[in-house]
Amino acid sequence: MLSVIILAAGKGTRMHSSLPKTLHTICGEPMLFYILEVAFSISNDVHLVLHHQQERIKEAVSKRFKGVIFHAQIVEKYSGTGGAIMQENKTPIPTQHERVLILNADMPLITKDALTPLLESHNNAIGLLHLADPKGYGRVILENHQVKKIVEEKDANDEEKTIKSVNAGVYFFERKFLERYLPKLHDQNAQKEYYLTDLIALGIKGNEKIDAIFLEEECFLGVNSQTERAKAEEIMLERLRKNAMDLGVVMQLPSSIYLEKGVSFKGECVLEQGVRLIGNCLIENARIKAYSVIEESQIINSSVGPFAHARPKSVICDSHVGNFVETKNAKLQGTKAGHLSYLGDCEIGKNTNVGAGVITCNYDGKKKHQTIIGENVFIGSDSQLVAPINIGSNVLIGSGTTITKDIPSGSLSLSRTPQTNIENGYFKFFKKP
């Protein structure tokens, strides 16, 4: 077994946000959560080092993950990546296992498989990337697959600048290596910080073997700005789309479809152009038509859209929800709502037809109220159902009706005033003085 230490103490100033960098989302999930999931898939001893807004991050993590061991970096004494794994007197964070994997919290694209080459090393090891354009990165000089030295770009000579091998920021150490060399680490540099790369240099000086393990560039993309966050999200979207299509989901123009990590599919599903699936959604044997938005909802044996919006807690089964229909906290069973309706805080029974422009008036300015509609109900266009209201089964509601009282089963309900036609009324109205 191994222990994992995740470094999440940085301010993330380049994000230009009051939200801690590691809580910025990638496909609906805080980026830190992705790496915590990977950590727990390979270890039962996971440590998280915090500083900036640590209570906010700790609260978010604790709601989702159990067993994370939190540490506060002592930045006043030990700043930098090397300082992050230091306790008082420069001793390393105590871990349960002899092998220690060190990861950065801003790498949400890391997978268990991507880490495998590093974890198979029997020596201390550092993860490397081979970059076509390594400009801006320190170079890693190799000799017989071992790290010889790490040179910062500003200190590299012309020959060293041609090297494409750079530090991925991922390390796999023996605990005794940390115990031996961490106390020797110093902050005698321009930034007055302790660096993990200097730890590598100390090990090389002490004749330690440091394996160089090349890793997949895409999986170790660091997120330090909103531009990099967007790039990481696009890569994650490609993974989620591929996973869905591998399950048999049909996607029309996949690049236009947005879905989040919590979305699940069952049966035969079709997603048309511009669909957005947000939060924990279940799409089962359903067709989501163009430019529809589904949030925290279940769509089962139904068609939705185009241009429909299922807001949170909508459960749409065996139904058709058409153009510009919005639902929220709505349970539809065998219902047809073809166009231009708002159905909120309601339950609608089988074989019910909702005409165009029908609104469930669920909010009275203070509280939300529920509308219950039975089976075999026909609701005429442009009707308003003022909640709380209970409509029985086998009910016919005339077009343009405002319902304010319960309707018993078998009833016809109308509330329109009689139509009056005034002869020559047009000419009288527009008569010039």
UniProtKB/Swiss-Prot annotation:
What are the boundaries of the region N-acetyltransferase?
248-433
Q: In which pathway does it act?
A: Nucleotide-sugar biosynthesis; UDP-N-acetyl-alpha-D-glucosamine biosynthesis; N-acetyl-alpha-D-glucosamine 1-phosphate from alpha-D-glucosamine 6-phosphate (route II): step 2/2; Nucleotide-sugar biosynthesis; UDP-N-acetyl-alpha-D-glucosamine biosynthesis; UDP-N-acetyl-alpha-D-glucosamine from N-acetyl-alpha-D-glucosamine 1-phosphate: step 1/1; Bacterial outer membrane biogenesis; LPS lipid A biosynthesis
Q: Has the keyword Nucleotide-binding been applied to this entry?
A: no
Query: Which residues of this UniProt protein bind UDP-N-acetyl-alpha-D-glucosamine?
Result: 7-10, 21, 80-81, 138, 152, 167, 224, 311, 328, 342, 353
Query: How is the cofactor bound here?
Result: Binds 1 Mg(2+) ion per subunit.
Q: One Pfam match, by short name?
A: NTP_transf_3
Give the cofactors, semicolon-separated: Mg(2+)
Q: Which GO terms describe its cellular component?
A: cytoplasm; membrane
Does the keyword Kinase feature in the UniProt annotation?
Answer: no
Q: What HAMAP family is this protein classified in?
A: GlmU
What exactly does this protein do? Catalyzes the last two sequential reactions in the de novo biosynthetic pathway for UDP-N-acetylglucosamine (UDP-GlcNAc). The C-terminal domain catalyzes the transfer of acetyl group from acetyl coenzyme A to glucosamine-1-phosphate (GlcN-1-P) to produce N-acetylglucosamine-1-phosphate (GlcNAc-1-P), which is converted into UDP-GlcNAc by the transfer of uridine 5-monophosphate (from uridine 5-triphosphate), a reaction catalyzed by the N-terminal domain.
What name does UniProt use for this protein? Answer: Bifunctional protein GlmU
Please give the organism: Helicobacter pylori (strain J99 / ATCC 700824)
